[in-house]
Amino acid sequence: MEDGNSQGNRQGGGRGRGGRRGGGSGQSREMQISKALSRLLRHQAENAGIKLDEAGFAPLDKVLAYGPLKSLKVTVEDVQEAVASSDKQRFSLKPNPETNPSLSTTSTSAADYLIRANQGHSIKLESSATLTPITLAEPDTVPARVLHGSYFAFWPAIIEAGGLKKMNRNHVHCSTGTPEEGVVSGMRKDAELVIEIDIVKSLQEGLTWWKSENGVILTEGDENGVVSSRYFREVRGRAQDVGVLWQDGQRVADLPDGITIRVPFGKNAHGGRGGNHGRGRGGGRGRGS
């Protein structure tokens, strides 16, 4: 969070912590706020008539007028807490210099702030305005490791596509480590496969890489939006030992028989939580991540 401190605990009303739950979803109010902010700032701003600046920031007062947030009666304090408490540092909040020339971080007026999602957009933004470039000309910017987390269900589709596809997002998302190593952004905690990418080779061959404010490593891929499998330094399982599937740009093994294949929640393009499982050789349905 760019403006520093959150405001601490809230009191009162039916809007307290864990209070109102919508649509039978069982989600806490805080989770509903975070998801609504992500959905708007990453994907729906244009449809909602909200103009993002070149760095991806939107006026907070207009954001809070967005239907799902308005229905939750979200306050500046709620947003400050959502920004400060996000385990993956999904958002940045800063004073709006046009309406808040003193750059106060204690104002309770939404008009005095700008907010953005740090990455994950399908809305087209200029990467150079929102992200830090990773280049061979500045070796200190190049991470020692670049990892992409995926799932057994999607591995056949990754092979078929010839690599990782950015899909409907602007970038393929990667991390500099795994969740068990304390890296909280760039890889889902339930990822089943770790794909290590040779970032140096890919940079040498023309791929562009970036780092977001919350430490996610991003690339647009090649002209087709793909990070080629020839850049896969190694692919292996996380919790399940499935051996090494790919090494130094070459396929060395298939997924073993008998493993459980599941489509993770939120990743099934055709709805549902994923199914029963078998080997799932036809799985993935085009997902690249």
Give residue ranges: language-model regions.
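Eukaryotic, polar/proline-rich low-complexity intrinsically disordered regions
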Residues: 1-289
